[in-house]
Amino acid sequence: MSLVQSLSALLFPQLNVCHLCGRALEHARLLCPDCERRARGCHLPPSQQAGYDLQQLGGTVSAFYYRGVPKQLVHLLKYQADTALAQWLGEHMAAVLARSSLANADAVIPVPLHAQRLQDRGYNQSLLLAQVLCSCTGLELISDALVRSRPTGTQVGRTRAERLQALRGAFAVSDPHRLSGKRILLVDDVLTTGATAIACAEALWWTGTISVSLVTACRAEKDA
């Protein structure tokens, strides 16, 4: 929860407030109309979805560019424990997935956190997004299929090559037989360089999966 939202909730406990700007809302919703409108301005159009192809993946789709309101929402979800925002982001991920060729996946797998990071944060934001996505689409969620076998530290500020090196061998599959012959859809919050998804895909390929694709809430712009 943001500072503005916390103050609004403290001063006006009977009101619903926008999770981003703290504006009082008449109805139970997560964002005010103005913040919703600004967020929609960052939607990733269908014509741009194919602009971030990764050879190791069957495809990628993202709901938003990683800027403006969507970027703020991801930060609130990830670092300020505003877990309610997973609902809003996950619904938009489900909508963009439904319009893509990746909607025929057999199973959804969230990108895992290392046990220590999970303990520190208290939740895995990718799992929260995956739960909403599966609720909207009816796809099967396999939440424990992947494990992060060693800590990799923050990837912020690292180059793509550095990320690939840091993440190589960082993921393992808990039960390979459960995934054999399935089309897997990975779920993560942000697609930046693709290093995390590639590392996950490399672990999953050994299980005999048919394909591994990725859906995220946001995608970094290549010139960002």
Residue ranges and their predicted role:
Residues 1-188, 192-224:
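Glycine-rich phosphate/pyrophosphate-handling loop used in enzymes and phosphotransfer proteins
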